[in-house]
Regions:
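Membrane-proximal helix-turn-helix segments that form the acceptor-binding/catalytic region
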Residues: 143-165
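Conserved donor-binding/catalytic core segment of Leloir-type glycosyltransferases
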Residues: 166, 200-232, 329
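Acidic anion/phosphate-binding donor-loop and adjacent secondary structure
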Residues: 177, 183-185, 192-206, 277
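Short alpha-helical donor nucleotide-sugar binding micro-motif in glycosyltransferases
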Residues: 269-270, 277-282
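Aromatic "clamp/platform" in nucleotide-sugar-dependent glycosyltransferases that forms part
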Residues: 290
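Short hydrophobic beta-strand element within catalytic cores of glycosyltransferases
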Residues: 298, 307-310
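Conserved acidic donor-binding segment of nucleotide-sugar-dependent glycosyltransferases
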Residues: 322-332, 340-346
């Protein structure tokens, strides 16, 4: 049975049991200026659930320049509340049915939990891409960071330990078990790669490195530039292109000016076609991130036949298969590894071939099935879906 057929079957069985309206809670919406891989992940499974016959509402926070009530790819989007106020606002709205009745709930926990086990008495699941850990100190002042860490690792886990949980990273899977989640309630599945991201065109005539992502502290773009500068001591004509925007853009610009780094290009935000062109032309894609749930740009680049060099962290270990689809290394060694890949055509071709083959195995249809299966299990179990409450 194909993944599309599996998805239709699961949705049909849920509909037969009266479960049609599914609310999906997320901190940010795909149309938010700061949207990233988590938001893309949510859009991919929601659109497919909608196509399979479920009625999906995406509840999220306000996005600048976007209407409060909207629709995208067939499902409804409601954007109300600020970055922090959205959490209590949604809990109250769902408790008192201000957003209408619903039959099942999906909570996407991105640092701050929605605490749905406390107020939701419907079949529900949790999606958690990664534990933020050291990211708290990068995003907030120390007292606030300490509170965030405590909520994420000590206060919230006991509330969720009986909640079916989906993650994309095997490392996050292990972290959840360490925090007390039941092994039988945690599932792990890879993200997909859109068929749009495919090989084509010619590589640049000179050694070229690409980095894609929101320019935030956790992505460590300044450290990546430092590592590419190290690579340039042996590959002097190597260049680096940074695609994306964000709060660190000024810091990045200042570094470029201070080091007269004419070899760095800031491409800014680009559309889908331009992004694919960057993937296709570059010799390799690199990431110096401190933490990732997966690293979607790395597998999109793989779909275009471009291998990766990335930090050896949770998330990257799933998106990049070391010495197969790319190479993983500690941050201080990244420059040396980048230089090695740029200098060795045979190594680069081998990694590119494996990266492309694996990317073709990663589908969003399989992801949509993998996320729906635990919710389906809650709906169809004899207890009527009350086991996780």
């Amino acid at each position: 049975m194909s993944d599309a057929a599996k998805l239709a079957h699961l949705a049909s069985e849920m509909l037969e049991r009266g479960v049609r309206r599914v609310h999906v809670l997320a901190w940010r919406d795909l149309d938010d200026d700061e949207a990233g891989g988590s938001e893309n992940h949510a859009d991919e499974f929601m659109r497919r659930w909608q196509e399979a016959g479920l009625s999906v509402m995406h509840r999220t926070s306000f996005a600048t320049g976007r209407p409060e009530v909207d629709s995208r790819n067939g499902y409804d989007v409601v954007r109300r509340g600020g970055r922090m106020s959205v959490f209590p606002r949604v809990a109250l709205s769902e408790t008192f049915r201000r957003m209408g009745s619903y039959d099942a709930l999906v909570e996407i926990w991105n640092g701050v939990p929605w605490l749905s086990p406390i107020w939701c008495r419907k079949p529900r699941i949790l999606i958690l891409h990664h534990i933020h850990g050291p990211m708290w100190e990068q995003m907030f002042p120390r007292p606030v960071a300490a509170i965030g860490r405590a909520i994420e690792t000590r206060l919230a886990p006991p509330v969720y330990r009986r909640t079916p949980t989906v993650t994309t990273s095997t490392d996050t899977h292990e972290e959840l078990l360490h925090l007390g989640w039941r092994p039988d309630l945690v599932t792990t599945g890879p993200v997909g790669v859109d068929e749009f991201f495919s090989p084509g065109g010619e590589k640049t005539a000179h050694p070229s490195v690409l980095a894609v992502g929101r320019q935030a502290p956790v992505k460590r773009f300044v450290q990546l530039m430092e590592q590419v500068a190290i690579a340039r001591t042996t590959i002097p004509d190597a260049t680096l292109t940074l695609v994306g925007d964000g709060p660190e853009r000024k810091v990045i610009r200042e570094w470029i000016e201070r080091h007269d780094a004419h070899w760095v290009t800031l491409a800014g935000r680009v559309d889908r076609e331009e992004l694919r062109d960057h993937y296709r032309r570059s010799w390799l894609i690199a990431s110096a991130s401190l933490a990732e749930g997966w690293g979607l740009a790395l597998t999109e680049a793989a779909g275009c036949g471009t291998p990766a060099v990335a930090t050896d962290i949770s998330g990257h270990r799933c998106s990049v298969l070391h010495d197969s689809t790319g190479l993983l290394a500690p941050l201080p060694e990244l420059g040396t590894v980048i230089a090695r890949v740029l200098a060795d055509r045979g190594l680069r071709d081998r990694l590119a071939s494996s990266a492309l083959a694996r990317a073709r195995e990663l589908t969003w249809e399989a992801l949509a099935v993998g996320v729906l299966e635990p919710l389906h299990a809650q709906v169809t179990r004899p207890s009527g879906g009350r086991r996780n409450r």
